[in-house]
A protein has these predicted regions:
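A short, flexible beta-alpha/helix-coil linker loop
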Residues: 97-100, 190-191, 273
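AMP-forming adenylation/ATP pyrophosphatase catalytic core
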Residues: 14-37, 60, 161-164, 229-335
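Catalytic subdomain that performs nucleotidyl-dependent activation
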Residues: 127-131, 136-227
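Hydrophobic (often cysteine-bearing) scaffold residues that line and stabilize catalytic clefts
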Residues: 44, 75, 201, 205, ...
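Short helix-capping/linker segments at secondary-structure and domain boundaries
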Residues: 55, 214-219, 285-293
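A generic secondary-structure micro-motif detector
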Residues: 69, 111, 169-170, 199, ...
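ATP-dependent adenylation/nucleotidyltransferase module used to activate substrates
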Residues: 2-148, 178, 185-186
Length: 335
């Protein structure tokens, strides 16, 4: 059926959905919205289209078709119709990688598709906007607490970040899913239903855990917000110290594929942090490897390092990763 979309009105320019886009995009003359057809990215594209037209900026929609469901062709047609309606070009990347459902190959699939996704983003040479909202942040909090990782950023996302040399902007990160749905319904914006399976961990958090917490005491989630805001200052301070320490780590390029990193075990920052898994995960991400060792592997390394030193030894952290441990240094070898 024909979409009876409400026209953008003067009062819409003062709404938070619009003003957040305006604040975050002011310095850019070109930007793209990664659109899936879900309510978040559909509403985001609506406001971004209005912003681009009003300010004479270049705007486009980009979509990755994973071809992993029978309905994918219909979804692409839906997005094409939407792009014509808001007068924005739609660029599509077709994925032809078959996903193996076994956990054994899941990491390889996710790593490969992530690289393709960010290479696609990078090809446009502009910031990419994503429709993540506050509910996504809450899901990340519980996922990170469950995995005992990313204590330095439990939300797992920020309004602006740089990932794989791509500027990522999330204008709706402080907006609730409910407010986004209500606004989309008011504006008659069509959208596809959430495809996250109800049986998945994310689905259970979205459909059961978070609603249960809200029913028990809605102030609990607000408390998470305030806690993260309060600790952000300390996170930023720690990150500055981490970056200074990281610059002091000696890198030795042995060949095109082999590198080593020497860590001073008596360095004050190292001594204060080496027993924290988040420290090792943060350090690992700076090495820009395609995959990382498991949490279990990092815990085993920490237990090894906590043991009083008696003699030189070698610790295997993962495939092609070994660590030579001496009294005063760690030498990490990557192959």
């Amino acid at each position: 059926p024909e979409i009876q979309l409400k026209q953008f009105e003067k009062r819409n320019f003062t709404e938070t959905f619009y003003t957040r886009c305006e604040e975050l995009l002011e310095q850019y003359n070109k930007f793209a919205v990664s659109i899936s057809g879900g309510v978040d990215s559909m509403l985001l594209s609506y406001y971004c289209s209005a912003y681009a037209k009003r300010n004479k900026k270049e705007f486009m929609l980009i979509h990755i078709n994973y071809n992993n469901r029978k309905c994918c062709p219909e979804e692409v047609k839906f997005l094409n119709d939407w792009s014509h309606l808001i007068d924005a070009p739609l660029k599509i990347k077709e994925m032809q990688i078959i996903r193996d459902r076994s956990s054994k190959y899941r990491e390889d699939y996710e790593r490969t598709t992530k690289k393709i996704r960010f290479d696609f983003y990078k090809s446009f040479g502009c910031p990419v906007l994503l429709g993540h909202n506050k509910d996504d942040c809450y899901e990340n909090i519980f996922a990170n607490l469950s995995k005992q990782i990313h204590f330095d950023n439990l939300f797992g996302m920020r309004p602006i970040s740089v990932n794989n040399d791509v500027t990522i902007i999330r204008p709706f990160i402080n907006s609730s899913k409910r407010s986004i749905i209500e606004k989309a319904l008011y504006l008659n914006i069509p959208y596809l239903e959430d495809s996250t399976p109800a049986w998945s961990v994310r689905g259970k958090m979205r459909d059961s855990l978070i609603p249960m917490i809200q029913d028990f005491d809605c102030n609990i989630l607000k408390g998470f917000d305030e806690y993260i805001k309060t600790t952000r200052f300390f996170e930023n301070y720690w990150e500055k110290k981490f970056n200074i320490w990281r610059d002091s780590v000696n890198e030795n390029i042995i060949s095109e594929t082999v590198k080593s990193y020497t860590i001073d075990k008596i360095d004050e920052f190292y001594v204060e942090n080496f027993q924290e898994m988040s420290f090792w995960i943060k350090f690992w991400f700076t090495l820009q490897q395609q995959s990382r060792p498991s949490n279990k592997s990092f815990r085993q390394l920490i237990e090894k390092l906590k043991t009083p030193f008696t003699r030189n030894s070698t610790h295997i952290l993962g495939k092609q990763v070994k660590i030579n441990i001496t009294e005063n240094h760690l030498v990490i070898h990557l192959e």
